[in-house]
Amino acid sequence: SVWAPWYTLHKLFSGLIDQYLYTDNKQALEVVTRMGDWAYNKLKPLDEPTRKRMIRNEFGGVNESFYNLYAITGDERYQWLAEFFYHNDVIDPLKEQRDDLGTKHTNTFIPKVLAEARNYELTQDNDSRKLTDFFWHTMIDHHTFAPGCSSDKEHYFDPQQLSKHLTGYTGETCCTYNMLKLSRHLFCWTGDAKVADYYERALYNHILASQEPDKGGFVYFAPMRPGHY
């Protein structure tokens, strides 16, 4: 009856890690490491069929948080947790350089690739780097609208049918936010101007444009439908 517990927990892990990294809040680090210990003790006994069944549900980028916690502490239990959330059905096709995105939920994919980017930075796993690069270019070249946003009703669609998806439900802000995060990783590795160009385009046309500066309003979608807001 619970929608996505690890998706919610990811926000707690990520926020506490940021508290420690950006404000040197030692209490935040203590809390998040205890949460990591709890997660390890809870998940370590699970068998493989149970693991695969569990990660079919959306879990956000909790594996990225575990990689970050591993980077901070050096505790290999947190690396194990990050690898535990490796989603074979999603990541394996990208390793094979296949665009298997279909009509799947867009923002379920991007955080999982973010975790692979972090894995490469910590372990020099070249498979993780290659699939990150492939995914980024596939997204930008085939699944992104002109302003830098992606998705219709939160899902991928056939890029050959783009004209049928100029709706009032395009451009989920979460997707662009995570694509900017992924772009930062890629640009640090390559210095590729194409990555920086996308970052600038998506930041100004979508992320900043989604906010109303005077009254504090914001929008969830960036509609591509003419005259729709």
Which residues fall in each region the model found?
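Glycan-recognition and catalytic cores of secretory/periplasmic carbohydrate-active enzymes
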Residues: 1-229
